[in-house]
């Protein structure tokens, strides 16, 4: 059935699939972070091409969302969400083993990309990822966000610099919808 709809859209002159935005709502998800040194395998390669090839990255804006990983079926591939804790837009572009284990128990989990797509920050970067991980880990995210939410484009990690101060623990998640 879906292939018939796609064929009808292509015949109607639409060269790319329609993206139907879901309604905005709040979802609580565990937050963890990953990057070049602890990606599996180490490096910047991601599972899904959502417009930048198979390379993790992004600034966190609506037009350049930061990569996040999750379990298959938890989010739509290439789905864009907004994270008030980071004040960044994120796009589901990768998979995550710990997310898979959590999702098997119906626990929502996002693993957010940090750092460079070309250089490993080694243990310094992994330590930064641990500092960025909130306690408690479960924070609200916004699914189906509008394009004009407040963004902090400060990189989470740049060689030897952990921007753990660029997180925002106090907010009313519902106000973002």
Q: Where do the protein language model's features map onto the residues?
A:
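Cleavable N-terminal signal peptides of Sec/SRP-targeted secreted and luminal proteins
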Residues: 1-17
């Amino acid at each position: 059935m879906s292939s018939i709809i796609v064929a009808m859209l292509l015949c109607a002159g639409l060269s790319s699939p329609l993206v139907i935005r879901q309604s905005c709502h709040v979802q609580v998800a565990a937050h963890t972070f990953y990057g070049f040194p602890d990606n599996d395998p180490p490096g910047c390669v991601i599972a899904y091409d959502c417009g930048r090839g198979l390379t993790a990255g992004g600034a966190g804006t609506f037009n350049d969302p930061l990569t996040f990983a999750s379990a298959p079926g938890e989010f739509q591939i290439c789905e864009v969400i907004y994270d008030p804790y980071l004040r960044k837009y994120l796009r589901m572009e990768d998979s995550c083993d710990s997310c898979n284990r959590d999702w098997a128990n119906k626990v929502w989990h996002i693993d957010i990309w940090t750092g460079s797509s070309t250089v490993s920050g080694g243990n310094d970067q992994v330590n930064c990822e641990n500092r960025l991980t909130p306690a408690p880990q479960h924070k609200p995210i916004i699914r189906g966000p509008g394009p004009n939410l407040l963004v902090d484009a400060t990189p989470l990690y740049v060689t030897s610099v952990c921007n753990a101060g660029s997180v925002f623990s106090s907010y009313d998640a519902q106000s973002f919808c």
